[in-house]
Amino acid sequence: MGASKVKQDMPPPGGYGPIDYKRNLPRRGLSGYSMLALGIGTLIYGHWSMMKWNRERRRLQIEDFEARIALLPLLQAETDRRTLQMLRENLEEEAIIMKDVPDWKVGESVFHTTRWVAPLIGELYGLRTTEEALHASHGFMWYA
């Protein structure tokens, strides 16, 4: 047997046509300058709107502060009234508890001054339940 003859493929006569190897992407979107201008415009608009909102927020905050300042004397009067009522109840309870002790003066101040000294929470709530004292010192708590 004889060796087979290999036939090699050859290009067509005149050669192959030119190969287009360049990228042919369509132009789309905005140019770089227009995107930069759009970004700067967005930043300026955002800054302006934040300044406008901050002015409005400051105006509302001043209004809230003025309302609190107007209500503060009323709230302080209610707190003072509640404190004095609790002190009166404590004095009545003290008179009942210490009635058998000689030379005991009910309501005698431990401070040797004629000025008003605000009572401590322990002094106010000493004869009350633990829940009331915790509520006064820490606020309302579910776990107390």
UniProtKB/Swiss-Prot annotation:
Q: What is this protein called?
A: NADH dehydrogenase [ubiquinone] 1 alpha subcomplex subunit 13
The record's family statement is:
Belongs to the complex I NDUFA13 subunit family.
Subcellular locations according to the entry: Mitochondrion inner membrane; Nucleus
Q: Which UniProt keywords apply?
A: Electron transport, Membrane, Mitochondrion, Mitochondrion inner membrane, Nucleus, Respiratory chain, Transmembrane, Transmembrane helix, Transport
Q: What function does this protein fulfil?
A: Accessory subunit of the mitochondrial membrane respiratory chain NADH dehydrogenase (Complex I), that is believed not to be involved in catalysis. Complex I functions in the transfer of electrons from NADH to the respiratory chain. The immediate electron acceptor for the enzyme is believed to be ubiquinone. Involved in the interferon/all-trans-retinoic acid (IFN/RA) induced cell death. This apoptotic activity is inhibited by interaction with viral IRF1. Prevents the transactivation of STAT3 target genes.
- Subunit-level organization: Complex I is composed of 45 different subunits. Interacts with CARD15, but not with CARD4. Interacts with STAT3, but not with STAT1, STAT2 and STAT5A. Interacts with OLFM4.
Give the domain of life. Eukaryota
What's its membrane topology? Single-pass membrane protein
| Gene transcribed to yield this protein | NDUFA13
Recorded source organism is Pongo pygmaeus (Bornean orangutan)
Main localisation, per the record?
Answer: mitochondrion
Q: Where are the transmembrane segments?
A: 30-51
> What is an annotated GO biological process for this record, any one?
negative regulation of DNA-templated transcription
An example Gene Ontology CC term for this record: respiratory chain complex I
